[in-house]
Design a protein with these regions (language model features):
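N-terminal Rossmann-like NAD(P)+-binding domain of SDR-like oxidoreductases, especially those catalyzing
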Residues: 1-208, 251-254
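Short donor-sugar binding/catalytic loops of nucleotide-sugar-dependent glycosyltransferases
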Residues: 47, 241-244
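Alpha-helix N-cap/helix-start motif
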Residues: 52, 102, 214-218, 246
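Glycine/proline-rich active-site loop of Rossmann-fold NAD(P)-dependent oxidoreductases
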Residues: 183, 196, 208-224, 231-233, ...
Length: 276
């Protein structure tokens, strides 16, 4: 089966696709899928997360991407990659992804998420202004959503108005250093479209899980619950356990990534909430 099963339109034969964080959990699945579809893929990766080397080996089973090893915080490095590869699409997935770690080291969180995104936007604007810039954002940009009344049942919390939902035009309300850094990046991506005419898509994702997610207690909770259960380790649940999260399998997210490119993009910037 094609990694992009379900796509209704394919308007290109082959694209040069740059994936930042391309050997991470989401990035490795995206990189492998793009290679399977016949695209030319470059991975920008610092290999700081455990498992990223094994993920690259998994990608190499399908094809051989160009690998740029370095940090998105390094502006000169980012510009060199962008100028050398000349991508037609940029999937920006590299990030510091844990709320807890953002509290422990807010500078690292800011530099990775906010400054790193800024560097990529500037490099795109300078070297490949026609490229499609796709940004992996987060539902954390909406804050705690305390403005919406909720009901507590015996097993879960739910909106008082069942059809309420969270729309893309919900006011942003950054909480935690992680929420602030990702929110700043999210805002920069949309504004670079308005000001400089870049073609951008922002995907505000929730809880993604699936193959090759090397979860830890601070991040990747579904994988961590499975790992902890297998190893007989205790699982910490904060609050009263009635919290509700949207969970989406990685294969479904990758199908969405394809649809973002293959669908009509008449607007310069698009923002989508990605639930489960």
């Amino acid at each position: 089966m094609s990694p992009f099963a379900g796509s209704t339109e394919k308007w290109w034969e082959s694209l040069r696709v740059l994936v930042t964080g391309g050997a991470g959990f989401i990035g490795s699945s995206a990189s492998r899928a793009f290679l399977s579809a016949g695209h030319e893929v470059a991975i920008l990766e610092d290999f700081s997360r455990p498992g990223s080397g094994a993920n690259l080996d998994w990608i190499n089973e399908i094809g051989t991407p160009t690998v740029y090893e370095g940090s998105i915080v390094d502006s000169a490095f980012v510009n060199s990659c962008m100028a050398g590869f000349k991508p037609e699409a940029v999937y920006h997935l590299a990030a510091q992804v844990a709320v807890t770690l953002s509290v422990q080291n807010p500078r690292h969180d800011f530099e990775t998420n906010a400054l790193g995104t800024f560097n990529l936007l500037e490099a795109t604007r300078t070297h490949v202004p026609s490229a499609h810039f796709v940004f992996s954002s987060t539902n954390k940009v909406y804050g705690d959503l305390a403005r919406y009344p909720i009901l507590a049942t015996n097993s879960r919390y739910s909106f008082q108005e069942p059809r309420q939902g969270i729309q893309e035009d919900t006011p942003l309300d950054f909480h935690s250093p992680y929420g602030c850094s990702k929110g700043a990046a999210d805002t920069y991506v949309t504004d670079y479209s308005r000001i400089y005419g870049l073609r951008t898509t922002v995907l505000r994702q929730s809880c993604i899980y699936g193959t090759r997610q090397f979860g830890i207690e601070d991040q990747g909770w579904i994988a961590w619950f499975v790992i902890a259960a297998l190893l007989g380790r205790p699982v910490k649940v904060f609050g009263d356990g009635r919290q509700v999260r949207d969970a989406l399998h990685i294969e479904d997210l990758i199908r969405l990534y394809d649809l973002v490119l293959s669908s009509s993009a008449s607007k310069k910037t698009r923002v989508f909430n990605v639930g489960g």
